[in-house]
């Protein structure tokens, strides 16, 4: 039991890094395979979605139908990854997943489902969430508030 406790942080960090690398690689490969028309359709669908947000009756919760639509957008790899956050200062790249449940936040960055999708545009406000409560976040602890991060979507 003692050995397990000593090895857990290292094994956990390795496992999370492996998962993040695989998710980012799969995402990048799938986006690279999109032809220009597919890419533009994905982007336009996300922009249309963002324009509907201010018109919703409940701005902070999605209906089941809205949730299905949300999860289908910016999902080029089919595994829920909608983009990548890069923090060049520490050489860190993390996948951005749909939603912010505990399972997502343990391994990656989550997108708050009722906020704008990360495609930019006037009046949009994309909210990304991550926390530092697990071992593989050691790198992120070194990031100052002034560090620049970039989010990439298809």
What is each model feature region?
Residues 1-154:
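Solvent-exposed, non-transmembrane regions of membrane-associated and secreted proteins
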């Amino acid at each position: 039991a003692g050995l397990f406790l000593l090895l857990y942080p290292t094994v956990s960090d390795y496992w999370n890094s492996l998962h993040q690398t695989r998710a980012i690689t799969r995402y990048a490969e799938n986006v690279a395979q999109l032809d220009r028309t597919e890419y533009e359709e994905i982007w336009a669908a996300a922009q249309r979605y963002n324009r509907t947000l201010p018109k919703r009756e409940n701005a902070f919760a999605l209906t089941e139908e809205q949730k299905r639509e949300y999860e289908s957008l910016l999902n080029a790899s089919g595994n829920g990854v909608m983009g990548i956050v890069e923090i060049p200062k520490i050489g860190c790249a993390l996948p951005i997943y749909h939603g912010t449940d505990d399972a997502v936040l343990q391994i990656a960055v989550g997108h708050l489902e009722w906020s704008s999708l990360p495609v930019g545009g006037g009046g949009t406000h994309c909210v990304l969430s991550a926390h530092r409560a697990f071992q593989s976040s050691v790198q992120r602890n070194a990031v100052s508030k002034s560090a620049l991060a970039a989010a990439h979507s298809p």
